[in-house]
A protein has these predicted regions:
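Short, well-formed alpha-helical segments that are part of the catalytic scaffolds
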Residues: 11-24
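Acidic helix N-cap motif at the loop->helix transition within catalytic regions
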Residues: 16, 41-50, 72
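A conserved acidic beta->alpha catalytic loop
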Residues: 36-45, 66
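Glycine-rich, basic loop-to-helix element that forms the pyrophosphate-binding segment
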Residues: 64-81
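Cell-envelope/extracellular polymer assembly enzymes that use nucleotide-activated donors
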Residues: 1-3, 21, 31
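Short hydrophobic beta-strand elements that form part
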Residues: 3-6, 33-34, 63
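Short helix-capping segments at alpha-helix termini
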Residues: 26-28, 52-58
Length: 86
C-alpha cells in the first residue's frame, strides 16, 4: 500500500496542481493524507472540492486546531498514513 502525506498551509495557489500530480502518477497511490495547519486562505475549500470530485481515491483531510508549524504538521501527516510506503 502506498500513502502520500501532505502538510498544507495557505497553499491555495498550488494545491490543485499538487493533487493532480499525485493523482496522475503512473502507479496510483492508495491514500492521500492531508493535514492542514490552520490555513487562512481557501486551501481547505479547494481540497474539499477535490475530494468530492475524486471519489476513486482515498483522500483524507485533517484540520489542526492550532498551527503546529511545518515540521510537526508533516510528522502528524506521516503518522496518519496506513501505507507500507509513504
Amino acid at each position: 500500500m502506498i500513502s502520500v502525506a501532505m502538510a498544507t498551509f495557505n497553499g491555495e495557489p498550488y494545491i490543485q496542481e499538487q493533487l493532480d500530480s499525485i493523482y496522475n502518477q503512473t502507479r496510483k497511490v492508495d491514500e492521500i493524507i492531508i493535514v492542514d495547519d490552520c490555513s487562512t486562505d481557501s486551501t481547505v475549500r479547494v481540497i474539499e472540492q477535490y475530494i468530492l470530485s475524486h471519489k476513486d481515491i482515498d483522500i483524507k483531510l485533517y484540520k489542526n486546531e492550532e498551527n503546529l508549524g511545518y515540521k510537526k504538521n508533516f510528522k502528524k501527516a506521516i503518522s496518519l498514513c496506513h501505507g507500507d510506503y509513504v
